[in-house]
């Protein structure tokens, strides 16, 4: 595919700087990713800080380990608090890419969504 080699392709994860800031603060306090996300999601001040930054750009480059940990913590927190059926996913139709579809569908199946 041409897109793989395109110079405009995004090759690294980017996170809204306000969210990354509150994430790092919460991680320093708790040293546990799931507890850190709980602190963020149940603290109105922290929620406001990153939610008000939406639509204003401000994305910064992050590393894969940090982003994957943040995503996993959010999923685990949601499953613990609300149950696995509250996770909604999207995979393209199988005709587009069976590998992409099967990977997403299998992940959702494994977490009980």
PLM feature segments, named:
Residues 1-113:
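N-terminal export/assembly segments and adjacent metallocofactor-ligating motifs
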């Amino acid at each position: 595919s041409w897109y793989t080699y395109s110079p405009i392709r995004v090759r690294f994860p980017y996170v809204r700087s306000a969210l990354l800031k509150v994430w790092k603060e919460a991680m320093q306090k708790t040293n546990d990713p799931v507890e850190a996300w709980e602190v963020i999601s149940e603290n109105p001040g922290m929620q406001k800080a990153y939610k008000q930054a939406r639509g204003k750009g401000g994305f910064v480059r992050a590393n894969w380990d940090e982003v994957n940990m943040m995503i996993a913590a959010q999923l685990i927190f949601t499953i613990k608090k609300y149950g696995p059926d509250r996770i909604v996913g999207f995979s393209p139709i199988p005709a587009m890419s069976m590998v992409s579809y099967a990977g997403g569908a299998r992940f959702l199946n494994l977490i009980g969504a």
